Amino acid sequence: PASDAGLRVVKVRTGIVQAANGGTLRLLRPLFAAGLGGRLGSGRQWLSWIGLDDVIDIYHRALYDDQLSGPVNAVGPEPVRNTEYTEVLARVLHRPALLPVPSFGPRVLLGEQGARELAEANQRVIPSKLMSRGHEFRHRDVADALAHQLGRE
């Protein structure tokens, strides 16, 4: 392994990336556009999100910051519960979020990939290492990240 050879190793653990044309936004936008957006299940599951611009910055830093090594959480500094994420996305898109999606809903509505991503999303992760090193996030909260990605700033 690289670490045995004395090389610096950074293991970037990436959260749910918020990108206008990919990931969960690509899957959720049509539902919200049709007025079918809503919290998933209980809505209490955590979402450790990261804006696309920020994830690019973090990978760049992982490559070039010689002081950074080991596991690094590439997530935004403020994880949110699914209920809050849903409310923010609805507000940014100017669409209602009235219909809660039952627990089997993600597989039916979002397919295997979407259901898998959302099932893995129930984690409250903090970017402690980055924050302790003074990393500056472009988007500190999910509302700002979603507004930026969806061109609603």
What residues fall within each predicted segment?
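NAD(P)-dependent short-chain dehydrogenase/reductase
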Residues: 2-11, 15-46, 52
